[in-house]
Amino acid sequence: MAIEYREWLEGDDLTLLEVWGGPETEQARQFRGALAVSSAGTDGTPWRRCIVAEDVIDGVGIPVAAGVVYEASLHPERLWSYIEVARDHRRAGIGATLLTMLRREAEQAPSGVTKLRAKVQPGTAGAAFAEAFGLAPIQRSRLVVVEPGALKLPVFPAKNDGGGPANDENAGSDVVMDLATGSVELTDVVGRYYTSIHGWDSPGVLSVGQVQKLFLDDLTGAHGALVLRVEPGSAFGAAVSPSKKGRIRAFAVSYAEAALDPAADASAQGAKATDVFVGHEPALDSDDAAAAVRDLLSLLAYQHPVMLELDDSMAALRAAVEPLLESGKARQAGADTLVVSD
């Protein structure tokens, strides 16, 4: 076979889709969209270099593989990279050549960043390729569905209702609250939490606008938030209602219903799970953070299943969810995702 390499051209995506067929992994589904015309990064679009490999037959080049490397404003310390080669052209050095060319292009990135990262699924050709070329895992991520009633509901203290006898009617009403996704208080804790769990790949300094756009804007599908607060106190004793709300201990942002895996057994999937992003105030100690997340998760999954992303860096969420996975009260949806890097 005679392989030639060139810049990505408009229309290559349609040709390659015919050659590649459907995506083999969720990572392929996600990153195929990053294959696009190269950009110098000067017109408001990220810097990008995209290269196509053609199999030349009788003087006609047929695209069979492509690779891309590009900058991102979020997590700017590494460049994202993606390579895909047609099944019948693998193990012929095409992927290795594309990676070498992309590394050379990365040296010209305006940011000066040259480290690469990619997402792979363990046990796949992509994971084996990454390992062979020195890209090692720096994070593991799983999608987990927590079944209804998996966690015991928290018990909140009875409340003094307007100076009358304590009763259970409003127990927890000053601790568990709905919050608008546009809330500045919510935006602040979400941004700081996201930064705290990404010490392995810093997101950089996140502005209020960036946090809103990433997690809380209507375009993300966010349609509600629930927070668990610190029990408020009153300077005038228990008989007087406190004038200020307690600070946020944990939060959950809910999104549009997650799509079910078409390859999974319908009876096993059951009711549709609500997609949620669960986190906590980063300043909490590990035990308090785990307790806060566990209590909030028990409320979220009281009657309906919820789906959440569980990264290995999310210590408090792991403390709540991993025992549920072991006991069968939660299940993993799909395969692990590994972020690999130089």
Task: Describe the predicted segments one by one.
Residues 145-181, 318-342:
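C-terminal "cap" of GNAT-fold acetyltransferases
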Residues 85, 91-107, 132, 283-302:
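Conserved acetyl-CoA-binding loop-helix of GNAT-fold acetyltransferases
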Residues 11-68, 201-240:
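Active-site rim helix/loop that mediates acceptor-substrate recognition in acyltransferases
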Residues 63, 71-83, 90, 247-248, ...:
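A conserved beta-turn-beta hairpin within the catalytic core of GNAT-like acetyltransferases
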Residues 1-4, 117-171:
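Hydrophobic alpha-helical segments and helix pairs
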Residues 1-39, 54, 155-206:
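Short amphipathic alpha-helix that is part of the acyltransferase structural core
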Residues 96, 104, 108-114, 118-141, ...:
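Conserved active-site alpha-helix within GNAT-family acetyltransferase domains
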Residues 268-326:
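C-terminal structured domain segments
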